[in-house]
């Protein structure tokens, strides 16, 4: 199978698995938002935000360093495996011991037992990380998809069932541990058919991996602050309940694109790595990737923005109506972040994550005051506006700081790659918004939302079918199995 065929096959398997995982995550979040109180929901979201940093530290970029290397020896793999395990134990102990201090700093001492319980995951998770990286390196996304879907389903079942009997944040924490255990066991079982770690350790042999991982980890930490500081600031200033509401909106508008984009970017990182020496080919494929990511995300986020006033009370309940303006602003944030995501794959493929790190450090100096001042002045809305302002600046500067040094001057291609998905999504935005105004009060809330979504989707489908843009035609051809279908979708 050629690299192109493997890449397309991998994207399809990743798409199926990721859509299922996102769907289960949204259902779980909706159930929890409805049956546990705002404070408990806030404690859950804040504890998961904190544990995300520990997760980044425990991996230390080792998994991606394995993928980036064209060739890697058994000694190097074994050393990296035991290094991962050791880091996991260190992170587990550190998080456990610091949990009370973290709760006090955030003015939420109830966080401590949740964080202590979550820390146990870091003894388990490292045993599966390397096997996942090896499967990804070989583009075996069918196995990865089945394993991750099974693990999420196990965690989802545990959380939802136990939450009905015990409506507390701890139920979701236990579900997370079940998810981690199942995921690690399955990756370990299938991964050992590829390779088995030995009892060897040579730190000198993995120096290149550690240098790559150090840059990647530093970049991830800065990116973590730029992503999650808003939740932590709100938790400290206004309490876990407000932070939970903000995070609920964030998980609807920003997190799905962050999880959907790896359908493409995780598959194309190893593919980019294989053509890292051909700048022209990289440039063409990168801008195609940018447009495809936009086509996936723009219509959904612009549509959500205009239906959010009906979506929130129907799905989460009226007790969360205060998050509607926050959700609308975060839809724009999510849209801008979605088109920034592929840049990471490009820089990793060229082993230039140092550029991303330096830029993210600069962005952090903008982000921290924007979030803190916004939170002090206008609460959740102020934090969201600060986030949006920094994201707009980030989108403008990304080309000059990160793309141009790697791909050369190509500003026109950058703008056109963003314009295409926006242009295709405009009818969805207009139709859904207009129907929301015209039919307000004439239909039940659920029916009105269904009509808005259905017509918005139809408008986007019509635009895709009618489009003769070369990239859109190329994408449509991937779904055509017959000449009749090609004619129907105008993909000939």
From Swiss-Prot:
Signal peptide: none annotated. InterPro entries: Poly_Biosynth_Transport, Polysacc_synth. Its main location: membrane. One of its GO terms (cellular component) is plasma membrane. It is a multi-pass membrane protein. Residues 34-42, 103-104, 179-236, 310-322, 386, 439-445 are periplasmic. The chain crosses the membrane at residues 13-33, 43-63, 82-102, 105-125, 158-178, 237-257, 289-309, 323-343, 365-385, 387-407, 418-438, 446-466. Keywords: Cell inner membrane, Cell membrane, Lipopolysaccharide biosynthesis, Membrane, Transmembrane, Transmembrane helix. It holds the Pfam family Polysacc_synt. The keyword Zinc does not apply. Pathway: Bacterial outer membrane biogenesis; lipopolysaccharide biosynthesis. It is found in: Cell inner membrane. PANTHER family: LIPOPOLYSACCHARIDE BIOSYNTHESIS PROTEIN WZXC (PTHR30250:SF10), PST FAMILY PREDICTED COLANIC ACID TRANSPORTER (PTHR30250). This is Lipopolysaccharide biosynthesis protein WzxC. It comes from Escherichia coli (strain K12).
